[in-house]
Amino acid sequence: LFVGSSDVYKRQEFDMATGGAYKVTYPSCTGSMQLLLMHNGEGSFYYATEDRNACGKELRAVCGSKSVTFVTEVVTSEGWTDATTGRFDLPWTTVVGYNPDGWQAAALQWYRPFTFTCEWGNKSLQSRNIPQWLLDKDLWIRSKGVTDTVMAAINKTIDFFGEGIGVHTYYWHNYPYDTHYPDYFPAKPEFEGMISTIQKRKCHAVPYINGRLWDPAADSYTALNGASASCRKADGTLYTEIYPTSKVLNTVTCPASSLWHKIIIGLVDKIQNELHTNGVYICLLYTSPSPRDS
């Protein structure tokens, strides 16, 4: 069994005996391509999902005595159901094929052309809308807090390494860390000045926001009915997590929710327009392999 991975090929090839099973999570470091290929000396069987949205899924292969079962397991998304009609559609097709010339030929003939139809594969790196300063960045530092001590440390770092550093800023909002998300505003009073100082020294500042948590204690959770966009367990109750950094109960928001899209887009626009940052880092927008239903 050969698994689509960014790792060295020989590390992702497995002997599959009767009763053997293999599973891989896509997308991940060990599953960077949404395909499985089973081959022997006679040829290769090809199994792939053609999902141009790169939705999270688990690909599995289970060997019986005379057969192999290939399975795609996925937690469904709110975005796959039409809000008007209520119709559910799986947003991809699954394709299979057999190539007598082996797994390399199968991948070149079927998977490679598919990647060129995807957002991540249909443009070269040079043609993508990526600012040059980001491409040129070879050193990032992370700052924690908005204090004179933190700013002094940033200035000292710039003095040593020179201009062009990226400063990844945390703890810039008024509420304690990992609480009241996504209600980041107002920012700490000194933060805009901190951004300006970094930029005057010809460096770039990119603050952190969390892309998945919605604190039920946040004003916006009640005002906007956050529970309607929160992920749920199989029994219908809210899926929640407690981070050791805050020890408060947070709900996890479905990344496909139109409500969450509006919140994140609006937040990013507000951070850049009002605080004049060079960008925004959205952490954990889609993460965690544990099963969740939205």
Language-model region placement:
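Short, solvent-exposed coil/turn linker segments
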Residues: D7-D15, N250, C254-P255
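Conserved structural scaffold segments of CAZyme catalytic domains across common CAZy folds
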Residues: F14-Y221
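Conserved small/polar residues in nucleotide/adenosyl-binding loops
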Residues: V3-G4, V8-Q12, Y286-D293
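Alpha-helix termination/capping residues and helix-transition junctions
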Residues: F2, D159-G162, I265, N273-E274
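Active-site-adjacent "subsite" loops/lids of carbohydrate-active enzymes
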Residues: P207, G211-K270
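Short, functional N-terminal and low-complexity linear motifs
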Residues: E119-S124, F161-G164, C231-G236, T277-I282
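Active-site neighborhood of glycoside hydrolase catalytic domains
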Residues: A256-S288, R292-S294
